[in-house]
Amino acid sequence: MSSIPEGLKYSAEHEWIAEAGAAGTVRVGITDFAQDALGDVVYVDLPEVGTEVTAGTAVGEVESTKSVSDIYAPVSGTVAAVNDELDGEPGLVNSAPYEGGWLFEITLADEAQLEGLMDAEGYASHTS
């Protein structure tokens, strides 16, 4: 059974979204369900800081021993930060998907777009 923390938002593409330190900025990662399906992550390709992203579009890739999967922007905005730790340790996506394995942060174009994402209960239904 995969972990689905309360207090986060979730996309249908298996990304989680959490409020980051700065107002109007969110942190994004892939869910425990997604990392489990991928298998051992060996490489992560992330968008560059400053890149404008649109919700639902591919912005990077996660490569595992099983496959290569797109990472989708769950919200629209500007990439504010990326997790450089993943360059040397991509397995953090597997071992700590909600902590050290986060992918990038986005400064939101509009905070109202968070309302269209799932809560933990909705995501649990989506993955069952």
From Swiss-Prot:
The keyword Zinc does not apply. It comes from the Bacteria. Residues 25-107 form the Lipoyl-binding domain. The keyword rRNA processing does not apply. Coiled coil: none annotated. SUPFAM superfamilies: Single hybrid motif. It holds the Pfam family GCV_H. Keywords: Lipoyl. One of its GO terms (cellular component) is cytosol. GO terms for biological process: glycine decarboxylation via glycine cleavage system. Its cofactor is (R)-lipoate. Binds 1 lipoyl cofactor covalently. The modification N6-lipoyllysine is found at K66. The glycine cleavage system catalyzes the degradation of glycine. The H protein shuttles the methylamine group of glycine from the P protein to the T protein. The glycine cleavage system is composed of four proteins: P, T, L and H. Belongs to the GcvH family. This is Glycine cleavage system H protein. The gene is gcvH.
